[in-house]
């Protein structure tokens, strides 16, 4: 196995992780929307979900940056 194969395997693992994180991010968005539509929304729970959603977004961006090489123009 050479470095390219290891890099490809790593990229595939990152892509899988990204897909999982994106799905969880979307699910949290749906949950927040559903909670906000309730007559008496639980603002503490909504805030917790939003913080988790933001943390997921940060991780998604970090992983996307790993996949994209830095290109200096």
Question: Which residues make up each language-model segment?
Answer:
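Short, charge-rich amphipathic alpha-helices with coiled-coil/heptad character
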Residues: 1-8, 29
